[in-house]
Amino acid sequence: MQLRKEYLIAYDIEDNKTRTIIYKQLLAYGLKAVQKSVFWGYVSIAELNAIKRLFDSSLTISDKVFITRVNMHEQKLDYSFGYDDKTFKDWDEYGHI
């Protein structure tokens, strides 16, 4: 059983300060910024709950976010530009974040 599961997180946050705080926090959780407001990576249930609390406490009614489970490391991308084959394969279950 994997301790961490693979997620894709995307957001649209108006306030620059809030957006910067969220960006830095997601990096601190070991997620990879695959675009400016899109993150991919593996998180534990506790980390996922902390990320949800971060969004709940930081977002306003005009902001948007979605978090979804993905399985990108095992499947071939239908189309991509600017990403190589290793972009979504660099995580080690027993490595460090």
Swiss-Prot record:
* Residues that bind Mg(2+): D12
Required cofactors, per record? Mg(2+)
Induction info reads: In culture expression is high during mid-log phase (2 hour), then decreases to nearly undetectable levels in late stationary phase (16 hours). During infection of mouse bone marrow-derived macrophages (BMDM) expression is maximal after 1 hour, when the bacteria is expected to be in the phagosome.
| General function of this protein | CRISPR (clustered regularly interspaced short palindromic repeat) is an adaptive immune system that provides protection against mobile genetic elements (viruses, transposable elements and conjugative plasmids). CRISPR clusters contain sequences complementary to antecedent mobile elements and target invading nucleic acids. CRISPR clusters are transcribed and processed into CRISPR RNA (crRNA). Functions as a ssRNA-specific endoribonuclease. Involved in the integration of spacer DNA into the CRISPR cassette.
- Give the record's subunit note: Homodimer, forms a heterotetramer with a Cas1 homodimer.
State if Metal-binding is listed as a keyword: yes
The alphabetical list of record keywords is: Antiviral defense, Endonuclease, Hydrolase, Magnesium, Metal-binding, Nuclease
Name of the protein in its database record: CRISPR-associated endoribonuclease Cas2 1
As recorded in UniProt, its EC number(s) are 3.1.-.-
InterPro entries membership: CRISPR_associated_Cas2 (IPR021127), Virulence_VapD/CRISPR_Cas2 (IPR019199)
**This protein's record includes keyword RNA-binding:** no
Q: What else is known?
A: Part of a type II CRISPR-Cas system.
Broad EC category? hydrolase
**One GO biological process term:** defense response to virus
What is the reported phenotype of gene knockout? No effect on expression of bacterial lipoprotein FTN_1103. Bacteria are as virulent in mice as wild-type bacteria.
